[in-house]
């Protein structure tokens, strides 16, 4: 493994100063071609050239139609369309062209150096609210977008038409992802929750479907003993803490600590990280305590980018906070939660701990590998039973950790590459290159030697067949604008999922 910062002029303003880079994505079916975007309202296309001793970047093109900062770039699964969106609230779909199309925002010098050209084919317009994240459907027919007006919007990628919108979050939607099995859509918000929508087909018209809110996950519930009830309901003295410790990293504490005057009582419902909510009186034998799963809006990050695994069996969500059960005075560490397909509507089955700063993004490698024979402990014996390994990267604000679905600890970690917070990560097609972007205006790259991550598995992952789409593919007659789940009863899609043999009471901590 080799990690290095690529020190070139990525994105810059009129004063020639570096501007933040907010997103990166590799083009599918290409030779390490990727796109970046940032605070200069530009999108740039690059070619990554790797060798045994160094990594070089070649400039290819600049896309200049946006008028404000661009927050996300995403290539479609085929790699022939690039979707971009940002603060102006408009999604633009770009396609390659043989002739340059100039605009007033184009730079003559960059245009002369360009080696390829792109043009806007489709424009998806919204109500003008800033868009933080995008994701394509597996068949490239649709796009979902999370926005600053607390909305999740779905567009037809062929026409740009807004098909449906959901307002089930109470704060900014900072991350979205589409299930590879085409059954679910997930959004994550700074309201400390994730929303899971099911794509349900109509019985009479299989080409027509709608999004139905199946679950909104924001807290985890524990059964407590009488002793535990006394410990967490004890009144606070002037010299006692609230039972919620500040993180060890006090130099960059992004969460507001609970005031010592906020005593925990039988009716307490403190909306803070690691907060407690009682569901029964203290003397009840059935008393339960629930804890918030995710960071609140004080987290200093524009993005919370979740990800499905390529086979659709796992979902990993960032921006988690874990409160160990029975330890009210324990510090609340940052974490990323893992959901299996069987638990996706309920609660996480495991969590990845040990991060000094919040997790902001997760990305799975497109390659799956043969199982290692030397692993002494694996997720397989705890939660999963997969005939292959999948590799995924977890990006914190200050570091990147690389895991696989077989081992319980990260096997690579990259730290101290940037002065400012990370914003996005992306894998290339062969899974040997991981790019990361930062607010400091630079990109860094982690390069793996062929075979370093393992032997590629010959096991085939079956995904739904692609289908043709039309502007009427989504039924928007049941749009939920009031914040509750749709009440229309539809016949759900039949998608095979793993059965849960027992109910999990709490996530299983996995410490690096």
Swiss-Prot record:
It comes from Schizosaccharomyces pombe (strain 972 / ATCC 24843). Its main location: cytoplasm. Keywords: Chaperone, Chromatin regulator, Cytoplasm, DNA damage, DNA repair, DNA replication, Nucleus, Phosphoprotein, Repeat, WD repeat. It holds the Pfam family Beta-prop_CAF1B_HIR1. PROSITE patterns: WD_REPEATS_2, WD_REPEATS_REGION. Residues 239-257, 469-490 have a biased composition (Polar residues). The lineage of its organism: Eukaryota, Fungi, Dikarya, Ascomycota, Taphrinomycotina. Component of chromatin assembly factor 1 (CAF-1), composed of pcf1, pcf2 and pcf3. Interacts with pcn1/PCNA during S-phase. Interacts with swi6 at the G1/S-phase transition and early S-phase, but not in the G2 phase. The CAF-1 complex interacts with histone H3-H4 dimers. Coiled coil: none annotated. WD repeats lie at residues 16-56, 65-105, 126-165, 168-207, 373-413, 417-458. Disruption phenotype: Viable vegetative cells but sporulation is inhibited. One of its GO terms (molecular function) is H3-H4 histone complex chaperone activity. Acts as a component of the histone chaperone complex chromatin assembly factor 1 (CAF-1), which assembles histone octamers onto DNA during replication and repair. CAF-1 performs the first step of the nucleosome assembly process, bringing newly synthesized histones H3 and H4 to replicating DNA; histones H2A/H2B can bind to this chromatin precursor subsequent to DNA replication to complete the histone octamer. Plays a role in the maintenance of heterochromatin. This is Chromatin assembly factor 1 subunit B. Belongs to the WD repeat HIR1 family. The modification Phosphoserine is found at residues 468, 470, 473. It is found in: Cytoplasm; Nucleus. Residues 239-261, 459-512 are annotated as: Disordered. One of its GO terms (biological process) is DNA repair-dependent chromatin remodeling. SUPFAM superfamilies: WD40 repeat-like. One of its GO terms (cellular component) is nucleus. The gene is pcf2. Gene3D superfamilies: YVTN repeat-like/Quinoprotein amine dehydrogenase. InterPro entries: CAF1B_HIR1_beta-prop (IPR055410), PTHR15271 (IPR045145), WD40/YVTN_repeat-like_dom_sf (IPR015943), WD40_repeat_dom_sf (IPR036322), WD40_rpt (IPR001680).
């Amino acid at each position: 493994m080799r990690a290095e910062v690529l020190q070139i002029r990525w994105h810059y303003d009129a004063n020639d100063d570096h501007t933040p880079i907010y997103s990166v994505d590799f083009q599918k079916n290409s030779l390490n071609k990727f796109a970046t975007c940032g605070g200069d309202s530009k999108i740039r296309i690059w070619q990554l050239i790797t060798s045994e001793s160094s990594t070089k970047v070649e400039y290819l093109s600049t896309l200049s139609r946006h008028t404000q900062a661009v927050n996300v770039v995403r290539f479609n699964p085929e790699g022939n369309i690039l979707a971009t969106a940002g603060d102006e609230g408009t999604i633009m779909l770009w396609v390659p062209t043989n002739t340059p199309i100039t605009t007033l925002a184009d730079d003559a010098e960059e245009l002369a150096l360009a080696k390829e050209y792109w043009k806007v084919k489709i424009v998806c317009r919204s109500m003008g609210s800033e868009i933080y994240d995008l994701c394509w459907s597996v068949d490239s027919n649709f796009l979902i977008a999370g926005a600053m007006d607390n909305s999740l919007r779905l567009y037809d990628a062929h026409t740009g038409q807004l098909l449906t919108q959901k307002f089930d979050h109470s704060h900014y939607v900072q991350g979205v992802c589409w299930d590879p099995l085409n059954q679910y859509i997930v959004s994550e918000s700074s309201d400390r929750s994730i929303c899971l929508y099911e794509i349900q087909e109509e019985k009479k018209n299989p080409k027509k479907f709608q999004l139905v809110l199946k679950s909104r996950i924001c807290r985890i519930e524990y059964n407590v003993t009488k002793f535990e009830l006394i410990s967490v309901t004890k009144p606070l003295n002037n010299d006692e803490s609230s039972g919620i410790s500040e993180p060890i990293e006090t130099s960059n504490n992004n969460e507001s600590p609970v005031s010592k005057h906020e005593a925990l009582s039988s009716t307490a419902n403190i909306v803070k990280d690691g907060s407690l909510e009682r569901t029964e009186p203290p003397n009840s034998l059935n008393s339960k305590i629930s804890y918030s799963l995710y960071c609140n809006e004080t987290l200093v990050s524009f993005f919370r980018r979740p990800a499905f695994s390529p086979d659709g069996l796992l979902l990993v969500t960032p921006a988690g906070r874990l409160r160990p059960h029975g330890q009210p005075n324990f510090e609340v560490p940052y974490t990323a939660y893992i959901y299996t397909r069987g638990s996706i509507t309920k609660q996480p089955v495991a969590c990845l701990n040990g991060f000094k700063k919040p997790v902001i993004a997760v990305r799975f490698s497109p390659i799956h590998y043969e199982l290692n024979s030397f692993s002494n402990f694996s997720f397989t014996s705890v939660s999963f039973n997969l005939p292959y390994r999948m590799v995924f990267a977890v990006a914190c604000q200050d570091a990147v950790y690389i895991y696989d679905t077989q081992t319980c600890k990260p096997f690579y970690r990259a730290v101290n590459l940037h002065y400012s917070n990370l914003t996005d990560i992306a894998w290339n097609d062969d899974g040997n290159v991981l790019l990361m972007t930062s607010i400091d205006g630079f990109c860094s790259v982690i390069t793996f030697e062929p075979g370093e991550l393992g032997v590629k598995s010959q096991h085939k992952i079956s995904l739904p067949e692609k289908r043709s789409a039309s502007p009427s593919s989504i039924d928007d007659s049941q749009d939920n604008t009031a914040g509750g789940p749709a009440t229309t009863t539809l016949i759900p899609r039949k998608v095979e999922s793993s059965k849960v043999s027992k109910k999990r009471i709490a996530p299983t901590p996995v410490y690096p």
